[in-house]
Every structure is written in C-alpha cells, then in structure tokens.
Amino acid sequence: MKIVEKPWGRELWVAVTDQYALKIIEFKKGSRSSLQYHKVKHEHIYVDSGVAEMEWENDQGQMEKLLLKPGDVVENKPGRKHRTTAIEDVRFIEVSTPHLDDVVRVEDDYHRK
C-alpha cells in the first residue's frame, strides 16, 4: 500500500490497476482540498467516518453544498467541480477509474498547480 501525504491529510492507495483504483482518503478537521475537477477520472466516494461539507457541481452546472455523514455516497463525474472541507476528522473510501494524476485545480489554499 502506498501512502501519499497531502497538506490536508493523506491518501492510502490500497489498489491501483489498469481498470480501477481504491483509496482511503483522510482529512484533518478544519482542512479542505482544492476546488478541482477531473478530465477523465470518474470517482465514487463513500464516507466511512466523520462529517464533511462538499462543494459539488450538480447536473445543471450549479455549485451546491452537501453535508456528508457516515454512509453517504457521492459520485464525481468527469468535468464536475468539487471540494471537501472537513468539519471533523474524515475518512473517505474512494473507488475510481485509474487516472490518479488527472486533477485540474481551480482554487487551492496550498498554492499547488
């Protein structure tokens, strides 16, 4: 398993194949990810523990705020903007296509490109 440290927490890459990827994503309370989208990557996120707010682009192209709790699932389709803010320490389980470098950051608190 590969561990990838992030400014907001870390990712544990459990499986990466030519068909899919499985990651455990951990956010520290009060941190947030970049506002981002993916050109090709398609992901489903399951909230394993904690509470988070997700800014999420809906089917009409409008940004919504979703309150995510354990047991919730969110689908992030290619081209859809999204950002996670951890209200508590949060753990997601993410299943996606294997395009792990496919990240376009629109806004980023940590000045990453």
What are these regions (language model features)?
Residues 40-58:
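Glycine- and acidic-residue-biased ligand/ion/polar-headgroup-sensing regions
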Residues 2-5, 62, 85-113:
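Double-stranded beta-helix
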Residues 23, 35, 47-48, 55, ...:
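Beta-strand residues in well-ordered beta-sheet regions across diverse protein folds
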Residues 58-79:
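Short acidic-glycine-tyrosine-enriched beta hairpin
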